[in-house]
Amino acid sequence: MTKSELIEILARKQSHLAYKDVELSVKTMLEHLSQALATGDRIEIRGFGSFSLHFRPPRVGRNPKTGETVSLPGKYVPHFKPGKELRERVNAVHEQ
């Protein structure tokens, strides 16, 4: 599902809200989540999951085109850990 598909679905389900209001709400929420992660904050949404940063240490990689070894710096990457309710809901759908 893309961001625009999410906005479409929410706008249809919440017909009392204007499409532009739903669009602004989704974009604002995603911007705040992104900003919180960028500043190193952990985000926890009970029942859904948590977002945090994990550090990937520096390593030696290889350029697949030339075969040359390349030194890659360490970096932080976003990490999502699903909550118990989300895991159970996903598993229930796939166990049928």
UniProtKB/Swiss-Prot annotation:
One of its GO terms (molecular function) is DNA binding. Gene3D superfamilies: IHF-like DNA-binding proteins (4.10.520.10). GO terms for cellular component: chromosome; cytosol. Keywords: DNA recombination, DNA-binding, Transcription, Transcription regulation, Translation regulation. SUPFAM superfamilies: IHF-like DNA-binding proteins. One of its GO terms (biological process) is regulation of DNA-templated transcription. Residues 59-78 are annotated as: Disordered. InterPro entries: Hist_DNA-bd, Histone-like_DNA-bd_CS, IHF-like_DNA-bd_dom_sf, IHF_beta. This protein is one of the two subunits of integration host factor, a specific DNA-binding protein that functions in genetic recombination as well as in transcriptional and translational control. Belongs to the bacterial histone-like protein family. Heterodimer of an alpha and a beta chain. This is Integration host factor subunit beta.
